[in-house]
Amino acid sequence: MHIEARLFEFVAVFFVIMAVLYGVLTSMFATGGVDWVGTTALALTGGLALIVATFFRFVARRLDIRPEDYEGAEISDGAGELGFFSPHSWWPVLVALSGSVAAVGIALWLPWLIVAGVVFVLASAAGLVFEYYVGPEKH
């Protein structure tokens, strides 16, 4: 996780520098003075990246060294079980579609579509989580 932490630390520093630069340049060249919305958004983005980098640093301390962190690692060092993946599941597609229904409802401010989207998101997320908790005869 050291590489991921370094990556997010770089992103955090980049966004903080860009926030300062953006604030200075908008104060010099914009007619209304400093654009506080953009400056705040860039600064908060840098802060969020710093939070993620700090989390990765703490996780990296607790884990053993991974093949990704070891410079002399071979490809075969990363072989083995990585986890369970369901390649034929339609539930992620349904979660995305129901999330987009809810987002369109929010964008157009249609309360009935927001409620329908939230219900669809909850139902499809439950289907995704409990997909393999049903009996084998159900598949």
Curated annotation (Swiss-Prot):
GO terms for biological process: electron transport chain. Its EC number is 7.1.1.9. Its main location: membrane. It is found in: Cell membrane. Pfam families: Cyt_c_ox_IV. Keywords: Cell membrane, Membrane, Translocase, Transmembrane, Transmembrane helix. It is a multi-pass membrane protein. It catalyses: 4 Fe(II)-[cytochrome c] + O2 + 8 H(+)(in) = 4 Fe(III)-[cytochrome c] + 2 H2O + 4 H(+)(out). Belongs to the cytochrome c oxidase bacterial subunit CtaF family. Part of cytochrome c oxidase, its function is unknown. This is Probable cytochrome c oxidase polypeptide 4. It comes from Mycobacterium leprae (strain TN).
